[in-house]
Amino acid sequence: MCGIVGFIGSHQAAPILLDGLSKLEYRGYDSAGLAVRDGDAPVQIVKAKGRLKALAEKTNNGETLKGTCGIGHTRWATHGEPSETNAHPHCSDDGNVVGVHNGIIENYQELKDKLVRKGYTFYSSTDTEAAIKLIDYYYKKYEGTPVDAINHAMVRIRGSYALAVMFRDYPGEIYVARKDSPMILGVTDGECYVASDVPAILKYTRQVYYIGNMEMARLADGAVTFYNLDGDEISRELTEIEWDAEAAEKGGFEHFMMKEIHEQPKAVADTLSSVIRDGRLDLSGVGLTEEEIQGISQIHIVACGSAYHVGAVAQYVMEDLAEIPVLIDVASEFRYRKTLLAPKSLVIVISQSGETADSLAALREAKQCGVKTLAIVNVVGSSIAREADNVFYTMAGPEIAVATTKAYSTQLIAVYCLALQFALVRGKMDEKRYSTLLEELQTIPEKIGKILEDKERIQWFAAKNSMAKDVFFIGRGVDYAVSLEGSLKLKEISYIHSEAYAAGELKHGTISLIENGTLVIGVLTQEQLYEKTLSNMAECRSRGAYLMGLTSYGRYDIEDAVNFAVYVPRIDEHFAASLAVIPLQLLGYYVSVARGLDVDKPRNLAKSVTVE
């Protein structure tokens, strides 16, 4: 949430900052601003409410802001309404310190009251202004360096933050600090970059540093110097990002979401190839030993949103194949109850960005309990990846659309691979069954591609039902887990009220909501549960519901029971979620397009939720 970009070099900063901010639009925002400095000249600050286009128009695409050092920001309102006044950057009373901030400062009112007593005035309703003026206060009080001032402020600020700050006395320099909020620093050819996320600077460099938690850095003269909380210099390793710049572009598609839907065969294949060697799974890179796998007493899966839905699939698959008890938790609830973790529990945290605040907090809670942790993440070097004991990296590449597609699909692959390996190592599966399932797993990319070839039927159905008032998704077992994701996809980008229910629960209250014309979508890929779910759908139809059924090739009898049928290739039922979800992703996309909505940037949502 929110986006930060910074630049120091020989080129004009403003166009680079605007370009970087445009790559962070998926994070969600309601206003934007730039602060640019040309040598010793005063900092120029320009802000605009609304889309980035308004800021670009104000600055003639950055041409009117001259200078080679600057910071930019897209704001998601937390403290104070969306407005030009509340937009970042913010500055001290005399303009000595200018900065931008991502996160939430929990004790901002306390800090603000202190600063008012010291003679400071406030023009905005934001917590960020308090942080910038606190840094200014300590800079003047101790007459030290910017690092000293930021250090004193960090000790007194409670909450999460990523800060990028410029000082009037230090032209051509940017200072950054972070606590529990993502930030990366890039370098190339004597120039330095700051960003909240990789896509913002991928066009300019793939050489990056990950600044550690509770650390600071100084960017100047094409180099980065790191400091710990004591102000001592420390070293950080330079990392090369393997993504290419083209991966963060639309590539001829109308929307990033449709591009990413079509990238799923490759993303799934890449994730599989990263862990399959000579016809067997090789999870040595993940880090769990066979002894540790054999000793697992139970698994806790912790995640948010679509990643939580992956956990719901994992629960069915892991318990059935590996015969390990699996519990799933919403990350935002995990640490607010007395979680009873057995000594040999394994906590699996799933997060595309590796920066999801609630998931990161849950990971830390698990580590404090002394249990083993494993992260399934897409971003190398992210906070969750760095702090987990073991990491399974998915190979989805950059995902720009707010509504996840390929990250979800690669996370499914990760849990399938873990389930197979756990089952084999724990003696719950023989070699023949293991080889058969592994071969089946490798057919998923081709089968996803086959589903995408028939997307026009989904488009027709979506257009016909784009004005639906309520939509209910139902299923049993893995199909219920897929229904959760299908419902989320529809509601988050089309704004249609949608819910998912275990099909057997309909009769316990929900069926009272079914009326003439209500759209009910049933997922029926589990052979043993097919008849039961079909019976539940018939109950809905008798009450006037309009039915869509999603099942496997060969189950053509469904056409006698539903108004519209969608088929996916047959596959072992443990892996059916990977195929069943594709038509539901397409449905959400096409309904949103038919309603004329912004598919990639739905209202009120952010791609990476980095505040609790």
What are these regions (language model features)?
Residues 157-191, 466-492, 529, 534:
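Acidic/histidine-rich
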Residues 1-254, 266-273, 277-297, 336, ...:
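Conserved short alpha-helical segments that host acidic/polar catalytic motifs at enzyme active sites
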Residues 294-436, 440-443, 523-569, 587, ...:
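Glycine-rich phosphate-binding loops that contact phosphosugars or nucleotide phosphates
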Residues 68, 72-85, 275-291, 314-350, ...:
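Glycine-rich oxoanion-binding loops at beta->alpha junctions
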Residues 264-268, 272-300, 390-519, 592-612:
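Active-site phosphate/pyrophosphate-binding segments
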Residues 231, 546, 559-561, 571-612:
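Generic C-terminus detector
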Residues 7-10, 121, 125, 139-143, ...:
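Hydrophobic alpha-helical scaffolding
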